Amino acid sequence: VGGISFIGSFTWGDDTPAFVFSDRLGPNSPKYIAECCSHESGHAVGLSHQSTYDNNCNLTETYCMGSGSGEVSWAPIMGNSYYRNMTSWNDGPTPYGCANTQDNLTIITSQNGFTYRTDDFTETLDAGTFALSNSFSIDGIITTNTDKDAFKYTATQDVSFHMDAVPFNVGANYIGANLDIKIMLYNGSNLIRTYDPAATMGVSIDTVLQAGTYYWVIDGTGNAYTTNYGSLGSYKLTGFNGPLPIHSVTLTGSTDRNRHALGWEIVADEPIRTQEIEISYDGIIFKPLSAFNSSTRAFSYLPLNTGMNFYRLKVTSVIDQVAYSNIIALKASG
């Protein structure tokens, strides 16, 4: 047993404790201790266990083990959440029947004399939106599953913009995090792009912004193994930008039989040190494909798959500033 608590003891008014035995958790594993603290706290504020049933309503797991593998694998806090990376409050069945569902968030915030904390950042896109500086480090929290946090950024000239959004966690690969982050980029009220990588809970952005005012909106999202119901919690935003010695990188492409022919043009004030074609199969997550010397301006490639291939060019100047081209999509013919 990793911990002990009484269901509903938070409201008894007599300081009844909940116990977590760290020497039995790992021993002393930060992930296991964090999960057990959350689990026993859940009992104290009125929650029962979360269970799993088959299609015929037969109980298969008294403690729901969750599902998935890797960084976005998921389990409910009130199940057995030790062995999945992402964990969260849940709205699902208890051991008392497949139709006996337990809305964790409603129970926690309506039966214990407290509710959600005050929102830290507004989601409105206007002059009052919190403004980012040219270099920033900000702590925020997605409080409810309808909460969004908006940040305004104004570029006075074309800039290379980098931002990392990291959910609060207790180890590598965001282990123990409760928040899977999605970021949306707006130009005024127009949604330009959504950053929601399928295989990771954090978001890393490298992009070029033309002069203008933009809004970055942070949201909790679901993934292949869970919904956005319990995708809540703290996060940190860090970022920086700077003027571009590389003014433009333009990538073009065509299909010749089954080969993809790529060509590009670079306009820059500084010499180019490295060039690298990157490939993606979803247009979001890119990986290196081939590197070239600074004078190369063309590349021919026979793709490994016959589906859609997305390409972009990553260019690094001699003063270590990075710029990316536009993204092009090509599909093998024939």
Residues of each region from the PLM?
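Short amphipathic, basic-aromatic surface patches that mediate peripheral association
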Residues: 159-175, 224-225, 266
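Short, solvent-exposed loop/turn segments in extracellular or other extracytoplasmic domains
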Residues: 147, 197-204, 292-299
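C-terminal edge strands of extracellular/lumenal beta-sandwich accessory domains
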Residues: 96-132, 149-151, 175-190, 206-244
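Post-HExxH zinc-binding segment in Zn-dependent metallohydrolases
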Residues: 66-100
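Non-catalytic, beta-strand-enriched accessory regions in extracellular/secretory proteins
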Residues: 132-160, 202-204, 215
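Short, compositionally biased serine/threonine- and acidic-rich segments at solvent-exposed termini, linkers
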Residues: 241-334
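Active-site-proximal segment of zinc-dependent metalloprotease catalytic domains
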Residues: 1-55, 75
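Beta-strand-rich extracellular modules
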Residues: 166, 219-221, 314-318
